Amino acid sequence: MTNPNNDTSTDNPDILDLLPRLQDGDAGVRRIALIELADLEEPEALPWLTRALTRDSSADVRAEAARLLEAWEEPEVVDALCAALTDADARVRGAAAQSLSELKSAEAGRVVLPWAVHADAFVRASALRALRELRLIDSVPTAVAALQDSDAFVRREAVGILGWLKQSDALPLLARLASDDSDTEVRRAATGALGLASDDSVLPALKAALKDREWQVREEAATTLGKVGQATAGPALLEALSDSYWQVRLRAVRSLGRLRFAAAHDGLVELLGHAISNLRKESALALGELGDDQALPALLAVEHDADPEVRKAVRIAIGQLRLQKA
């Protein structure tokens, strides 16, 4: 049977049963019919779903179609979802962006890639977001160019792609964003992406980020310094133990333990008495990582901490130190 209103046709009885409601004058009826159509999980139903996404007069129906197409990666579906990123209704654009972010195949990514240079910033950012999850090497040049985009969301998604793909050639550009970008989230994302470095070339940028005016960036810098694994980061992390935000101090504690920075001993012992239990717990674990049995008296003094998670961490640290001492 051919639908008189479009060029789609089918002999599938389940789809045929739904056609009258798919063409109903009531948008609510059409939306429910679309849901039932998607439940069939039939590739043959895709033309009706994509038509609803691109042509239905109701934003509710278009948004529903965008959500229902999430699991499909046929080129025509992906292209329709990309086109829906330009829809006049924000709900439709958001649903299309979410469905695109669930794509898994490189073939789908190649359909998305041209949309990453669209004139509209939301389209560019959404396309880059979808490409990030796909780890499509073809997207690297586009992502590098997007690091200089005027829109912060686009820059942040570009950083994500380069980080996921571990593009070490982009490290100088990422370091500059980590230090100089005007947007907090871009600086934070770029700081995290510097963790892919295998040498100390990014340490100046990370140390600068550890003094950023926004604590979220400082927190990311403290974490990333531990991942880079350079002992020369120790003094900067030690200084971060006095940061005004406990979240930054906590990440600095973890990184100091990870680096086994011996000079952190006194600072970590002091934090065993901090009012925030998470800091006490992480400090105990870090002291265990340092491997200095001179921390045993301080750990034994807090083995009956009021917080069970702290007590557990203290026991782990004491066990580590005693094992090394034996």
Each predicted region: which residue ranges?
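A generic tandem-repeat structural signature
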Residues: 58-157, 161-164
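N-terminal "cap/leader" segments of large eukaryotic alpha-helical scaffolds
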Residues: 1-32
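Core register positions within helices of long alpha-helical scaffolds
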Residues: 36, 68, 99-102, 130-133, ...
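Short inter-helical turns and helix N-cap capping residues of alpha-solenoid HEAT/ARM repeat scaffolds
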Residues: 25-26, 57-58, 88-89, 119-120, ...
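Terminal, low-structured helical/coil segments at or just beyond the last alpha-helical repeat
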Residues: 303-326
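Amphipathic alpha-helical scaffolding segments comprising HEAT/armadillo-like alpha-solenoid repeats
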Residues: 10-21, 42-55, 74-86, 105-117, ...
